[in-house]
From Swiss-Prot:
Substrate binds at residue 250. Residues 181-326 form the KARI C-terminal knotted domain. It is an enzyme of class 1 (oxidoreductase). GO terms for biological process: isoleucine biosynthetic process; L-valine biosynthetic process. This is Ketol-acid reductoisomerase (NADP(+)) 2.
């Protein structure tokens, strides 16, 4: 595994250049501010709206996406996956020029052919492995979060060096930047989201909750046992892996882990995981998601509404009112 650190990167490669950060959401605001604090000239490219006003209030020169691309030598695309291809075709593509670098923090649109940059620009990825607020906070504390780096197209012969300079400007080389490919990052990221982190976990939590309530147990108790306490376990795993988690729980819980876990996640579950991975690798999921967006998201919206009306959500909202240490978000906005 090739990993790059501070000594391997030179942020001075960005001196005299302008970086355009396209999008000012979770990653956009963090990367733009970290770069600025590292002495890099940054402009923000967004359309008029809330993000435009926030970026302006944060002291950035804010302009249209097309103007930002014309101004910059490095263009970082930090819009949501489903918006990138449209914005690229409408405002980025015709303004690219020889020797520029087009950067991404997720490989979806490049890997699945939704964006096809011209051969005369560098195409690379710097993907911090933390949400934007943590990228910013850890940087301000003098540290950094790990990241991935990949080069898809090296027109200038310096793509990796410039990408590492960008990673250093964001603070990621302080922790370590692991070399990967657009294919590996994209396929593993989608699989992790679908099979484990989002799809797998939410299905497991709901199934456990429903099993208890259907068995006659009160929904409030089922919520505590199947969702609320999940954070306690995940935090232990996050801090020290499975061994630390198992060391920290009771022996009864640990024994139950060993003898029961494989009855829940069975060989059939793993076979289904492999089918999910194959669908991702063959582009079936990407095609489904692209078509879903083109159709106005009918399936997405229907499933989202149904999930929000699940008994688990209603019970959870009531119980969280008892938890003074939980600060509910004022507004649920996708960044």
């Amino acid at each position: 595994m090739k990993t790059y650190y501070e000594k391997d990167a030179n942020v001075e490669l960005l001196q005299g250049k302008t970086v355009a950060v396209v999008g000012y959401g979770s990653q956009g605001h963090a990367q733009a501010q970290n770069l600025r604090d590292s002495g890099v000239e940054v402009v923000v490219g967004v359309r008029p709206g809330k993000s435009y006003e926030v970026a302006k209030a944060d002291g950035f020169e804010v302009m249209s996406v097309s103007e930002a691309v014309r101004t910059a030598q490095v263009v970082q695309m930090l819009l949501p996956d489903e918006q990138q291809a449209h914005v690229y075709k409408a405002e980025v593509e015709e303004n690219l020029r020889e020797g520029q670098m087009l950067l991404f923090s997720h490989g979806f649109n490049i890997h699945f052919g939704q964006i096809n940059p011209p051969s005369y620009v560098d195409v690379a990825m710097v993907a911090p492995k933390s949400p934007g607020h943590l990228v910013r906070r850890v940087f301000q504390e003098g540290n950094g979060v790990p990241a991935l780096v990949a080069v898809h197209q090296d027109a200038t012969g310096t793509a990796l060096h410039v990408a590492l300079a960008y990673a250093k400007g964001v603070g990621c080389t302080r922790a370590g930047v692991i070399e990967t490919t657009f294919q590996e990052e994209t396929e593993t990221d989608l699989f992790g989201e679908q099979a484990v982190l989002c799809g797998g976990v939410t299905a497991l939590v709901k199934a456990g909750f429903e099993t208890l309530t259907e068995g006659g147990y009160r929904p409030e108790i089922a919520y505590f046992e199947c969702l609320h306490e999940l954070k306690l376990i995940v935090d232990l795993m996050y801090e020290g892996g499975l061994t630390t988690m198992r060391h920290s729980i009771s022996d009864t819980a640990e024994f139950g882990d060993y003898v029961t876990g494989s009855r829940i996640v069975t060989d059939e579950t793993k076979k289904e995981m492999k089918r999910v991975l194959t669908e991702i690798q063959q582009g079936e999921f990407a095609k489904k998601w692209i078509l879903e967006n083109q159709a106005g998201r009918p399936t997405y919206n229907a499933m989202k509404k149904a999930e929000q009306n699940h008994q688990l959500e209603k019970v959870g909202a009531e119980l969280r009112e008892m938890m003074s240490w939980i600060h509910a978000p004022k507004e649920l906005v996708k960044k």
